[in-house]
């Protein structure tokens, strides 16, 4: 599934008259690069959620015959549902016998999506989150077995966790030690069908990152560390488009 429903506020003025997914990187709309990358990784069916200037995305993908993929649209024009709500709404469009890879339309990386998906299958995780060690203000906290323990904003020191018996300990985590590590989320993750019933029970609008830490004490929600040499950029800001173009030219082949 590709998240493409956002308003693209950070990308103004590019998104004044088009959706973020249609902003060009290296000569093509973001959505084209992501669909082609998923196809090269062996995926055959992609769900795209749409909201802001949705008809532009739908028309473009249809005009290109889905880039050789089966593409289904999850229409959020009536209401933006946030990341978790977007997945929840799209559940009926998924093949519920297989895990679903989720990818933000504005995330560009050299991640090997086929290898990531295979690693998730092998792990038996309920959810696998591609993470890396990079500077940010918001992190996931994992234990030494890669299990998700909490979410933390290091600027405000806010910690969110369902592991309440460890809250005092987790409050003190500000870097890597023998037991815990801070890792940044990449916006690429895989959800197993075991979590679909829980997603269905959530409110209509909710964040998937909140869902993950809320469920982490009861389910196998784990991080998968990006390999050495990992390149990544959030192309949601104008100044990041050039770096996204570099990654496309190097890795989207």
Where are the model-predicted features located?
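Catalytic-core segments of class I nucleotidyltransferases/pyrophosphorylases
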Residues: 99-101, 108, 114-121, 134-135, ...
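Active-site metal-binding loops of divalent metal-dependent hydrolases
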Residues: 7, 105-107
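Short catalytic helix/loop segments, enriched in acidic residues and glycine
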Residues: 17-32
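N-terminal nucleotide-binding beta1-loop-alpha1 segment
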Residues: 1-16, 39-41
């Amino acid at each position: 599934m590709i998240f493409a429903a956002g308003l693209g506020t950070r990308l103004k003025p590019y998104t004044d008259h088009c959706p973020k997914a249609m902003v060009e990187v290296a000569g093509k709309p973001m959505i084209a690069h992501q669909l082609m990358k998923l196809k090269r990784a062996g995926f055959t069916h992609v769900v795209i959620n749409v909201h802001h200037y949705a008809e532009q995305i739908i028309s473009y993908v249809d005009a290109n015959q889905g880039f050789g993929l089966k593409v289904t649209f999850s229409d959020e024009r009536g209401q933006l549902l946030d990341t978790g709500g977007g997945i929840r709404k799209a559940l009926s469009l998924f093949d519920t016998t297989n895990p679903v890879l989720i990818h933000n339309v504005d995330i560009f990386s050299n991640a090997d999506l086929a290898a990531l998906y295979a690693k998730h299958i092998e792990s038996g995780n309920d959810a696998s989150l591609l993470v890396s060690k990079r500077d940010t203000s918001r992190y996931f906290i994992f234990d030494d077995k890669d299990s998700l323990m909490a979410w933390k904003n290091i600027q405000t020191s806010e910690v969110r966790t369902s592991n309440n018996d460890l809250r005092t300990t987790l409050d003190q985590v500000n870097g890597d030690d023998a037991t815990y590590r801070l890792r940044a989320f990449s916006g690429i993750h895989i959800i197993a069908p075991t979590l679909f019933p829980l997603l269905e029970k959530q409110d209509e609008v909710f964040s998937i990152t909140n869902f993950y830490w809320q469920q982490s004490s009861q389910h196998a929600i784990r991080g998968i560390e990006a390999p050495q040499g990992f390149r990544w950029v959030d192309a949601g800001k104008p100044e990041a488009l050039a770096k996204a173009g570099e990654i496309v030219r190097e890795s989207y082949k």
